Amino acid sequence: MKDCEYQQISPGAAPPPASPGVHRPGPAAPPGPSPGPAPGAPRWSVSGSGSGSGSGSGSLGRRPRRKWEVFPGRNRFYCGGRLMLAGHGGVFALTLLLILSTTILFFIFDCPYLARTLTLAIPIIAAILFFFVMSCLLQTSFTDPGILPRATICEAAALEKQIDNTGSSTYRPPPRTREVMINGQMVKLKYCFTCKMFRPPRTSHCSVCDNCVERFDHHCPWVGNCVGRRNYRFFYAFILSLSFLTAFIFACVVTHLTLLSQGSNFLSALNKTPAGVLELVICFFSIWSILGLSGFHTYLVASNLTTNEDIKGSWSSKRGGEASVNPYSHKSIITNCCAVLCGPLPPSLIDRRGFVQSDTVLPSPIRSDEPACGAKPDASMVGGHP
């Protein structure tokens, strides 16, 4: 069945001629031009056409969509796709609340007294640490961690065909793994059934964000994002600077309470600075976890490992197997630190701000029994009438 193209008839156009042998009853129309349709009620005619030119006219008034609007993962985008965050943001909001509230209370109740009594450098150091911590946190949270775009329909079909061709003639399904050699070490590449591709080395699929992330370290709900190749340096700088800020505020609050309690008891000092108790509680319970996390990631950076690799024991004997050499290590702590923290930042691969292109099929010589990728099958192939 041919496609139909609708064209508007001008009001002064004559009606189409009647087919031969067909009698049209009714009174004859008076001579003269036809009155035409009423205002607001245009007439339409249907003309057969084999081309799909009518589909372009219907999309003239439609706003072109950007790629972040149809992104298949569970991320949320802000500012027109310029910023991205994980699907859940409650824990990230709690992180912001704890940092902001503790620092604001410190600047209101402790900094004025310490600046007058000791030195003006205390509020300056606290302000520098605070702005550096917030900058690293926002960069970690709103930066693309290294998401790999999913395979298109054509790419997935070609890869499936390639996998089927490599399988044996038995009923056993073909293997979904590949092996590559990296610095003399055999590394196994696994197939991602969600993204329809073989994951590159050190890439893993995050079950929370539903994305394959390059050099996947872990998913951190405290920063509201995955930690991967493109934002790991910001994450490491964030936890390291946050440990310094927490320890600095804790030491300053203790010093403030000690100076106030010299002329009186400790309870009267607490009455003068009621926010000091809240600051001490938050800093005391935060500093141990933050310092431990900073030390653990310092070990990972020096060894050029990821949290995912360390937990799985990929290059150690944690799971009872033989310990193997880490193929990504440069055999030097300084070189590993420079490679992880100071290397060039790769560009984002998902093109969040790009426009969604319409699915067009390029003319190519194909077999008559195999439709082109992206083309609709003929009606006779799906049980319809030709």
From Swiss-Prot:
Principal EC category: transferase
Location(s), subcellular: Golgi apparatus membrane
Example of a GO MF term: palmitoyltransferase activity
Catalytic reaction annotation: L-cysteinyl-[protein] + hexadecanoyl-CoA = S-hexadecanoyl-L-cysteinyl-[protein] + CoA
Protein EC: 2.3.1.225
Alphabetic keyword roster: Acyltransferase, Golgi apparatus, Immunity, Innate immunity, Lipoprotein, Membrane, Palmitate, Phosphoprotein, Transferase, Transmembrane, Transmembrane helix
UniProt topological domain (Cytoplasmic) ranges: 1-88, 139-233, 297-386
Protein origin, superkingdom: Eukaryota
Modification sites for Phosphoserine: S19
Stretches for region Disordered: 1-65, 362-386
One BP annotation, GO: protein localization
Membrane topology, record value: Multi-pass membrane protein
Active site: C220
Main subcellular localisation: Golgi
One Pfam family, short name: DHHC
Known role: Palmitoyltransferase that catalyzes the addition of palmitate onto various protein substrates, such as CGAS, HRAS and LCK. Acts as a negative regulator of the cGAS-STING pathway be mediating palmitoylation and inactivation of CGAS. May also have a palmitoyltransferase activity toward the beta-2 adrenergic receptor/ADRB2 and therefore regulate G protein-coupled receptor signaling.
Domain notes per entry: The DHHC domain is required for palmitoyltransferase activity.
Protein name, entry field: Palmitoyltransferase ZDHHC18
Lineage: Eukaryota, Metazoa, Chordata, Craniata, Vertebrata
